[in-house]
């Protein structure tokens, strides 16, 4: 589990570096796109609302308990805000630096496991068929 946590920390650092290295034009467009998105105004991150499939569901299942509790809190708060048709104050919005793709290491690991499983499922031993 420590390797996945270190991978998440590494993704977080590379994400911050990637944001810092954007050109002015790219930064302006990405900032506009991010700030007009509704999910950050109610305190969510992109991976909280990303489209679900089997791989993403498994990645959510493998999250550490603290991260799952944080995500559950963000979703509950966002549901309440959405039901009340309100948004958070500007200071509480999710910032781009905080919107870290925290599921990426888990998704990559699961996809690699599925590829390995498919390889072994389709494996034909040379001893079986001479």
UniProtKB/Swiss-Prot annotation:
Gene Ontology terms: biological process: mitochondrial electron transport, ubiquinol to cytochrome c
The keyword Glycoprotein is annotated on this UniProt entry: no
Protein's name according to its UniProt entry: Cytochrome b-c1 complex subunit 7
Subunit note: Component of the ubiquinol-cytochrome c oxidoreductase (cytochrome b-c1 complex, complex III, CIII), a multisubunit enzyme composed of 3 respiratory subunits cytochrome b, cytochrome c1 and Rieske protein, 2 core protein subunits, and additional low-molecular weight protein subunits. The complex exists as an obligatory dimer and forms supercomplexes (SCs) in the inner mitochondrial membrane with cytochrome c oxidase (complex IV, CIV).
Signal peptide range in chain numbering: none
Coiled coil: none
KW Magnesium (keyword) present: no
Organism of origin: Echinococcus multilocularis
Lineage: Eukaryota, Metazoa, Spiralia, Lophotrochozoa, Platyhelminthes
Family: Belongs to the UQCRB/QCR7 family.
UniProt entry keywords in alphabetical sequence: Electron transport, Membrane, Mitochondrion, Mitochondrion inner membrane, Respiratory chain, Transport
GO terms under cellular component: mitochondrial inner membrane; respiratory chain complex III
Pfam families (alphabetical): UCR_14kD
InterPro entries assigned to the protein according to its UniProt record, in alphabetical order: QCR7, QCR7_sf
UniProt cross-references to SUPFAM superfamilies, sorted A to Z: 14 kDa protein of cytochrome bc1 complex (Ubiquinol-cytochrome c reductase)
Cellular localization per UniProt: Mitochondrion inner membrane
Main location: mitochondrion
């Amino acid at each position: 589990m420590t390797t996945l946590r270190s991978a998440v920390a590494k993704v977080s650092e590379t994400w911050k570096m990637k944001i810092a290295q954007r050109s002015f034009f790219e930064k302006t467009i990405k900032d506009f796109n991010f700030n007009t998105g509704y999910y950050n105004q109610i305190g969510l991150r992109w991976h909280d609302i990303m489209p679900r499939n089997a791989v993403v569901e498994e990645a959510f299942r493998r999250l550490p308990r603290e991260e799952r509790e944080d995500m559950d809190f963000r979703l509950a708060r966002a549901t309440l805000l959405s039901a009340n048709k309100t948004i958070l104050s500007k200071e509480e919005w999710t910032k781009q630096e905080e919107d870290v793709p925290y599921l990426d290491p888990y998704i990559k690991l699961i996809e690699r496991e599925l590829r390995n499983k498919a390889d072994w499922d389709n494996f034909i031993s040379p001893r079986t068929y001479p």
